[in-house]
Amino acid sequence: MADKAQLQEAIKTQGEVVRKLKSEKASKEQIDEEVARLLQLKAQLGGDEGKHVFVLKTAKGTRDYNPKQMAIREKVFNIIINCFKRHGAETIDSPVFELKETLTGKYGEDSKLIYDLKDQGGELLSLRYDLTVPFARYLAMNKITNIKRYHIAKVYRRDNPAMTRGRYREFYQCDFDIAGQYDAMIPDAECLKLVYEILSELDLGDFRIKVNDRRILDGMFAICGVPDEKFRTICSTVDKLDKLAWEEVKKEMVNEKGLSEEVADRIRDYVSMQGGKDLAERLLQDPKLSQSKQACAGITDMKLLFSYLELFQITDKVVFDLSLARGLDYYTGVIYEAILTQANPAPASTPAEQNGAEDAGVSVGSVAGGGRYDGLVGMFDPKGRKVPCVGVSIGIERVFSIMEQKAELSSEKVRTTETQVLVASAQKNLLEERLKLTAELWNAGIKAEVLYKKNPKLLSQLQHCEDTGIPLVAILGEQELKDGVVKLRNVASREEVDVPRAELVDEVKKRTS
């Protein structure tokens, strides 16, 4: 907009948009996005007047996290990592970018979302899209044939983000995978048990875990009349059933993917089926599906899986759902996805960036997904040697969003530090004594703070504890120094007791353990 009057009118209109959003108490992300647009318009106007206005904002699809949000994230990570470790997993790390050829051809229709980097001297590079393909590359490169690993790191997708719906271009994934040649369905059952434990401990609300098998899907497509070359693309369309009505999915199959209406209707008859071990038994008797060796192998494994899930006592949360497809190309066997049926509290909008999960219309949304990918490592091995793998990815951004909303609704204050005690003084000229005592506490492993003023008022020191949630104050005064004691104050109850200086460390540890 070169015309100054037009630019001023656009600024006025955009200002009204921002004010309206604020009055409607819209989400912070939505307001920030519109404010950024307003600032960009103002920057253009400033440029017309010979000034350069630098717009301070994060890149599209990214965000900053304040101390309160990070405290919540740390709590969530700790719960998840403890579950991973309880199951005997060890952790690895890998580069944030890979050779482009490492990632190409592994994600089906989602490959267009891979972030390519500008050529920096010969190697074509891309930012990692998930943690699974780099893990497979790591196994092949290091000739590892069995490992149980977890990996928590950021991944990148060149999505067109609508941050009001919690979609980002940079987000965390939390992956757990078991690699190795083992007896059928035992590692797969453990992955489902792990998901059950994590979601139960996070207390996000009611959930269910949907399971299916790629072999059953492929067998189903074959007997329904889907051409072999269209299996993967139809799989991606079926994967949208958690977000779209059947009519919309059918329309895509017929109009965009070229299936006949008759074939689409046959698919519908199967994808509407749900159950448990009983459904697996029924499908083995299905006159058409039982003709597919591939489907029968998947159904037989599904029966075995449910027998192990019964031993783990989690079948009340697991449903065999033939509509579950998961669009990623590398799955070869069992696939699963955990969805929240009722969040606690139900979020208005929640992030969905995890291994293939997106906003779901029929439930609060997917919070975990995964499956078996026995052929992926072989794609990287020069001799094509396969390492069977099964794993799960926790949709951590969605979890963070729900936990943040729970914190907003809770009366309990979120602490952003772990300070156990503040070293304070009741009189002036005691800075040296405060610093000496603080050093003693630090040396003993106590988390302690001291205010950076020579002569702070006692009231302001106590107020700092109230504001930040520090539970104890160690108060020094001239009399306390003479008597060799420290006055230890409980901030919540305001009770004070004189503690001999030599016993202070033990007393603080006892009270804060």
Swiss-Prot record:
<dbReference type="InterPro" id="IPR045864">
    <property type="entry name" value="aa-tRNA-synth_II/BPL/LPL"/>
</dbReference>
<dbReference type="GO" id="GO:0032543">
    <property type="term" value="P:mitochondrial translation"/>
</dbReference>
<feature type="binding site">
    <location>
        <position position="326"/>
    </location>
    <ligand>
        <name>L-histidine</name>
    </ligand>
</feature>
<feature type="binding site">
    <location>
        <position position="173"/>
    </location>
    <ligand>
        <name>L-histidine</name>
    </ligand>
</feature>
<keyword id="KW-0496">Mitochondrion</keyword>
<dbReference type="InterPro" id="IPR009068">
    <property type="entry name" value="uS15_NS1_RNA-bd_sf"/>
</dbReference>
<dbReference type="InterPro" id="IPR006195">
    <property type="entry name" value="aa-tRNA-synth_II"/>
</dbReference>
<feature type="binding site">
    <location>
        <position position="177"/>
    </location>
    <ligand>
        <name>L-histidine</name>
    </ligand>
</feature>
<dbReference type="InterPro" id="IPR015807">
    <property type="entry name" value="His-tRNA-ligase"/>
</dbReference>
<dbReference type="GO" id="GO:0004821">
    <property type="term" value="F:histidine-tRNA ligase activity"/>
</dbReference>
<dbReference type="InterPro" id="IPR000738">
    <property type="entry name" value="WHEP-TRS_dom"/>
</dbReference>
<dbReference type="InterPro" id="IPR004516">
    <property type="entry name" value="HisRS/HisZ"/>
</dbReference>
<dbReference type="Pfam" id="PF00458">
    <property type="entry name" value="WHEP-TRS"/>
</dbReference>
<dbReference type="GO" id="GO:0002040">
    <property type="term" value="P:sprouting angiogenesis"/>
</dbReference>
<feature type="domain" description="WHEP-TRS">
    <location>
        <begin position="3"/>
        <end position="59"/>
    </location>
</feature>
<dbReference type="Pfam" id="PF03129">
    <property type="entry name" value="HGTP_anticodon"/>
</dbReference>
<dbReference type="InterPro" id="IPR033656">
    <property type="entry name" value="HisRS_anticodon"/>
</dbReference>
<keyword id="KW-0030">Aminoacyl-tRNA synthetase</keyword>
<dbReference type="InterPro" id="IPR004154">
    <property type="entry name" value="Anticodon-bd"/>
</dbReference>
<keyword id="KW-0436">Ligase</keyword>
<feature type="binding site">
    <location>
        <begin position="130"/>
        <end position="132"/>
    </location>
    <ligand>
        <name>L-histidine</name>
    </ligand>
</feature>
<dbReference type="GO" id="GO:0005739">
    <property type="term" value="C:mitochondrion"/>
</dbReference>
<dbReference type="GO" id="GO:0005829">
    <property type="term" value="C:cytosol"/>
</dbReference>
<keyword id="KW-0067">ATP-binding</keyword>
<feature type="binding site">
    <location>
        <position position="157"/>
    </location>
    <ligand>
        <name>L-histidine</name>
    </ligand>
</feature>
<dbReference type="InterPro" id="IPR041715">
    <property type="entry name" value="HisRS-like_core"/>
</dbReference>
<keyword id="KW-0547">Nucleotide-binding</keyword>
<dbReference type="InterPro" id="IPR036621">
    <property type="entry name" value="Anticodon-bd_dom_sf"/>
</dbReference>
<dbReference type="GO" id="GO:0006427">
    <property type="term" value="P:histidyl-tRNA aminoacylation"/>
</dbReference>
<feature type="binding site">
    <location>
        <begin position="330"/>
        <end position="331"/>
    </location>
    <ligand>
        <name>L-histidine</name>
    </ligand>
</feature>
<dbReference type="GO" id="GO:0042802">
    <property type="term" value="F:identical protein binding"/>
</dbReference>
<dbReference type="GO" id="GO:0003723">
    <property type="term" value="F:RNA binding"/>
</dbReference>
<dbReference type="GO" id="GO:0005737">
    <property type="term" value="C:cytoplasm"/>
</dbReference>
<dbReference type="GO" id="GO:0005524">
    <property type="term" value="F:ATP binding"/>
</dbReference>
<comment type="function">
    <text>Catalyzes the aminoacylation of histidyl-tRNA.</text>
</comment>
<keyword id="KW-0963">Cytoplasm</keyword>
<dbReference type="Pfam" id="PF13393">
    <property type="entry name" value="tRNA-synt_His"/>
</dbReference>
<dbReference type="GO" id="GO:1901342">
    <property type="term" value="P:regulation of vasculature development"/>
</dbReference>
<protein>
    <recommendedName>
        <fullName>Histidine--tRNA ligase</fullName>
        <ecNumber>6.1.1.21</ecNumber>
    </recommendedName>
</protein>
<keyword id="KW-0648">Protein biosynthesis</keyword>
<comment type="similarity">
    <text>Belongs to the class-II aminoacyl-tRNA synthetase family.</text>
</comment>
